[in-house]
Structures are given as C-alpha cells and as structure tokens.
Amino acid sequence: MTHWIAGEWVAGTGEKLQSHTPYSHELLWQGYSASGEQVDAAVNAARRAFLDWKKRPFAEREQKVLAFAELVKANSEQIAQVIAKETGKPLWETRTEAASIAGKIAISIRAYHERTGETVREAAGNQLVLRHRPLGVMAVFGPYNFPGHLPNGHIVPALLAGNTVVFKPSEQTPWTGEVLMQLWQQAGLPAGVINLVQGSKETGIALAQSRGIDGLLFTGSANTGHLLHRQFAGQPDKMLALEMGGNNPMVISEHYGDLDATVYTIIQSAFISSGQRCTCARRLYVPLGTKGDALLDKLVSVTANLRIDQPFAEPAPFMGPLVSEAAAQVILKAQADLQALGGKSLLEARALHAAFITPAIIDVTAIERLPDDEYFGPLLQVVRYQTLAQAVELANDTRFGLSAGLVSTDDGEWDYFVEHIRAGIVNRNRQLTGASGDAPFGGPGASGNLRPSAFYAADYCAYPMASMEGETTLLPATLSPGVEL
C-alpha cells in the first residue's frame, strides 16, 4: 500500500513508481502513483479533518507531535539506513539527519509560542488582543536531498498551528516518506490530519492545482519553484512558501589564515553530500598571487583524494553517489559546457559506476559571462580576483541569494563583506552549509520567499488576528460632528 489517505493505507491507481539505490540499482520500494482522484481524496480528507483539528487545544496537538518525536528517536537507526539506501549519502551523514528530524521539533514548539502565540495588552481603555489562526489545508512538497528533515520543517509547524497536511515526497525518495508516515500513524493523529500521496510530476501538478488547498510549502529546485510561483499568480488567498537553491559564492581573502583549515572549510562547503545541498558553495573566489596559488594547489590535492564509496562502506566515505545517474550526467554535461566556454579544469570530474562521479574543480576566470545556474552536485567553479570589492561585485552577480561566505581573519574585510553581500545566510570562517535551526533559512531573489525552517516556518503556518475589545460599548462625552442621539 502506497498512500496514507483519510487514516487508511491505499494502493495507487496511477503510473508505476520505483526507488532504487543509486549505488547498486537494488530495488528498494515500488508502488503506483496517486491518481488525480486520489489526490482530491487526500485533500478532501484533510479539509474534513481541519474542522476538528483546529479546535483542539494546543496541548493536544503538541502531544501528538511529541509522540512522533519519540518514535523518530526510537527508530532513528532505521530512518538513517533507509535515507542512506535511497539517497546514497554516507551513513554517518544520514544519522545526523535522523537526529535533526526529532531535534527541531522542540524548536518548532518554542516558535509557536514566541511567534504565533496569544498576547494581550491595554491601550486607551481598550484591550488589544493578538491571536493566530491556522490557514487550513497545507500541501507539503519534500526534496530528495534531505527527505526526512526538510519536509518536517514544514509539517511540524503546520500541525502545531492547527493546519492539516497533504505530503508529497520527492519521487526519488518515496520509501523515506512512507517510513515517516508510518510513524505519524503510530503517533495517533486523527484520520485526515496528515495524508501521504506518492508520485512524480503528474501527482505534484494535481496537488498544486487543487482548489482545496490553502497553502503550498515547497523545498526543491528553482525551476519547479518558479513554475509554482507562476501557477499561483493571482491567487493571494493561498500561501506559497518556496525554499529553492542558490549559486552560492564563497570568497577567500588573502588573509585566510591557516591553509589546512581553509581547505577543509571549502571542501565542507562544496562537496559534502556530494554537493547536493542547496547551500553548497558553487563559486569560489580566490585572490591572485602566490597565496591563492598555494590554496588552490592544496585544495585540488585534497579533493582528488576524497574517499568516495557506498553509504555503508568501511572505512566511511566522505562522498557517496549522486541521487541518480541522470543527476550525475547533469554535472558532467555542466563541466563540458563550462570547458567549451573557456573554463580550465583543475580537477576533472569522471564518471564511475552507477551514479558515482568524482568531484570537479574548474577555473572559470576566463569566461566572460558565467552562466548563472545552480549545478547541484560536486562541481566547484573558481574565479581569481584582484580586490575584495571586485570579488564581492562578482559574487553578487547572480539572480539567487541563498548563502555566501568569507574566509578572512581581517575584521575590516568582514565588515565590508557583510555590508555589501546580497544573501540570506552569510557566514564568516565557517562552511556555507552550516545553518542553525532557530535562525532564518533562505534568501532573496530566485532562492525563494519567506524563511522555511523549524523556527520561522511558524510565520507562514498561521495568520494573525488583531482584536480591539471591551466588555461593553462606550458612548463618548463628545459625539462625532453630524451625529445626534
């Protein structure tokens, strides 16, 4: 049974859907996609459940979410292994994701009270009350790179606020979605409060176009997110929260400090998760001169020797495969395209077996107009620069704005950088892929809108209701002109 609709597991009636390991082609999961009628059934079930769920005390909703958190903790190793098999990420990495699923729930609960709770104050003889109310039925679209952690950054705040949910995982990771939905089932949520529909493009279109949803919470590619944005144009009654990707710049100052620490920070920024994090560094700005040369020499040497293997290998790998052979081919084609434009490979990516490829580092300084694309994989573009002002200007030459970073021991350089850079996540002497769960996550431009994360997700899961209240009506001492009683 593939889908969880109205408190029951049902088989799909759409096209066949399968999930294989990206490292051995082993069949992990199979079923049939949800048809348009089944998507409608899930949305209708969520609509019916919303009428009751929104009225339940917060403490009761919180108890169900906390029960889910305990189940995640109890099953964290199984979750980690499922994610590792389905995405190809090393087991050490998926274990941190499994822990994050439960860990961010406490942050979401705190956010509910701090950002969407109820406040009362007195002013000019009136009682001013701020309340928050749920929006209704929320469609949640999950990505494949963090198939457990990122969707729950939407789902948990939505449920706490009193919304109901229809969740569509990525078609690349249906098994992870099913395992997590089984835990929600065990947590005892009433029928219809959360629903699962599996499928690819057609299922996603049916859910996004449903007239019964009140909002859509999306984490995924910029292309899909922009299609959703155009689709929702002219529908201000629907909430649309988009967390998309970035063409993220990382600037290395001549004052970068320790060479090994800097190289390690770059590798963690560019190649962790095989480059399949939306905050990964895509463009590396390196100063001209001997210090920049030394940095690149060491970076190429260390990157060439990164351990690449299947998720459960011993000793543990740093990188696994990409999520699919198709994704690997996209990176290899991007490398070829950049070479054709005049890029010089410092370390050339090579296709291995299955979806494995080696990382690429390519000097693109000579390319007059660098394509503004997100290469979602282990491909790092290097640009040599003369001044920090030039580097920042080049770094800002992108339609995206997700993350950026500066490696520098000079406080004045950091002050200049943080004042002039355009990005939502800006780190100093830290990897670009590091972010706090209780900080805003996202950025301006084509990287999305709002700030989808455990804490700030509370903002788009409820709307504020402002009230001015008094126990009785009041008759002023002086009436408005033209009124006689």
Swiss-Prot record:
InterPro entries with a match to the protein in the record: Ald_DH/histidinol_DH (IPR016161), Ald_DH_C (IPR016163), Ald_DH_CS_CYS (IPR016160), Ald_DH_CS_GLU (IPR029510), Ald_DH_N (IPR016162), Aldehyde_DH_dom (IPR015590), SuccinylGlu_semiald_DH_AstD (IPR017649)
Keyword Oxidoreductase appears in the UniProt entry: yes
Reaction equations catalysed: N-succinyl-L-glutamate 5-semialdehyde + NAD(+) + H2O = N-succinyl-L-glutamate + NADH + 2 H(+)
Binding site for NAD(+): G220, S221, A222, N223, T224, G225
Enzyme Commission no: 1.2.1.71
Molecular-function annotations in GO: succinylglutamate-semialdehyde dehydrogenase activity
Gene Ontology BP term (one): arginine catabolic process to succinate
Recorded family membership: Belongs to the aldehyde dehydrogenase family. AstD subfamily.
UniProt name for this protein: N-succinylglutamate 5-semialdehyde dehydrogenase
Gene giving rise to this polypeptide: astD
